[in-house]
């Protein structure tokens, strides 16, 4: 059910994203995701370039979609902001979205978000296949409630609380995380790429 714009990012109150198996009780909400693009930290120009590539070519609501996507990021600035644990494919840092200026600003923004004490961003190198290439996903739950998985495809988004689906996606995340660079190495890489590639 749902659509790519109907996942946990659009419903932070109902699905304050958290993953019980990746946190200790009482640590508050957390957001754990694997992604092929830096959606939680997208700049306006980057979001606009991504959304402009929709296959239906319908740009009538582009401004509205961009504004909605940026508004969802406000959850990260709250005092009660969730813990964010995001694993990005290295290709995100090198794929030309919107041109050099857009990419440089986007990676500076990503580096800024990575400095937030509630945020962990790791980069997985592009040297081979990994489970994160199969789908964009978010694992989410509320304290005391069963975890929920949001899976996004090119056609739609799907939310499920199936225990088997949650277990499968959680295992995928663990495997992706095991192959990713450390937080410190990832941070330095995110800082370095704009100067080396997008000048």
Regions found by a protein language model. Name each.
Residues 18, 24-199:
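Hydrophobic protein-protein interaction segments
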